[in-house]
């Protein structure tokens, strides 16, 4: 009886301890080129906020439970001085190595909200365009991953091609309600269908049919840039 009573007192504490554990994100660069990984929740950096990743390198960050609207992305063709100030051709976040805000399009985005009523929510988004192929998967059991690894840049419509590389979203280029959904009412367009055809797992426009994956709270994750490069090496 005493043991049962002790369990009932300890159970809420153990549950709270589980739900309060920071999630681990391993960010891996399998591209043949250097990228500058970034992690932010919009108003502040996540962990260090950003880091250079040469081909084959990885960076592990810890993200606090309850984080809502976090994003991880790759920046390309960057230059930073010793103070961490500089510029990137895609994904630039105000000229900082350690991002405190979200990046400038085009960016392929790994998006997540952690421990929302005991659940994690993850997705990949092309709403802000595409710059680097990506896989976003749990490293613990309980849910599947999502991937956008098609050659979007190579097939990008001429009007969406970004001068610094990557493929812009239509809202960034045209700035109209049809593409930006500023009225709260919009449907798929020829450009969103282009993204959806190549990456069905990813959001293609603001009101796209949800492709969010629900995972158990306190799961750990891996974000891989250029995931198919790894598969080719393993063959």
Curated annotation (Swiss-Prot):
It is found in: Cytoplasmic vesicle. Gene3D superfamilies: Thaumatin. It comes from the Eukaryota. Coiled coil: none annotated. Transmembrane segments: none annotated. SUPFAM superfamilies: Osmotin, thaumatin-like protein. Residues 1-22 form the signal peptide. GO terms for cellular component: cytoplasmic vesicle. InterPro entries: Osmotin/thaumatin-like_sf, Thaumatin, Thaumatin_CS. Pfam families: Thaumatin. Its main location: cytoplasm. Residues 230-235 form a propeptide. PANTHER family: OS03G0233200 PROTEIN. Belongs to the thaumatin family. Taste-modifying protein; intensely sweet-tasting. It is 100000 times sweeter than sucrose on a molar basis. This is Thaumatin I. It comes from Thaumatococcus daniellii (Katemfe).
């Amino acid at each position: 009886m005493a043991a049962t009573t002790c369990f009932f007192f300890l159970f809420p504490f153990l549950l709270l301890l589980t739900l309060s554990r920071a999630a681990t994100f391993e960010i891996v660069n399998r591209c043949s080129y250097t990228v500058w990984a970034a992690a932010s929740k919009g108003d502040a950096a996540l962990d260090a906020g950003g880091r250079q990743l040469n081909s084959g390198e990885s960076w592990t960050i810890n993200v606090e439970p309850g984080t809502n609207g976090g994003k991880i992305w790759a920046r390309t063709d960057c230059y930073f001085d010793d103070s961490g100030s500089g510029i990137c051709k895609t994904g630039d976040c105000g000229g900082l190595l350690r991002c405190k805000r979200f990046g400038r399009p085009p960016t392929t985005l790994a998006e997540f909200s952690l421990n929302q009523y005991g659940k994690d929510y993850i997705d990949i988004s092309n709403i802000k365009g595409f710059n680097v192929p990506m896989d976003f998967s749990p490293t613990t059991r309980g849910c599947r991953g999502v991937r956008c690894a098609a050659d979007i840049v190579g097939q990008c419509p001429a009007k969406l091609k970004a001068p610094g590389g990557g493929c812009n979203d239509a809202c960034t280029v045209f700035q109209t309600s049809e593409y930006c959904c500023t009225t709260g009412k919009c449907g798929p367009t020829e450009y969103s269908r282009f993204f959806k055809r190549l990456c069905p797992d990813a959001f293609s426009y603001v009101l796209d049919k949800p492709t969010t994956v629900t995972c158990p709270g306190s799961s750990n994750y891996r974000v891989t840039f250029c995931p198919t490069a790894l598969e080719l090496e393993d063959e």
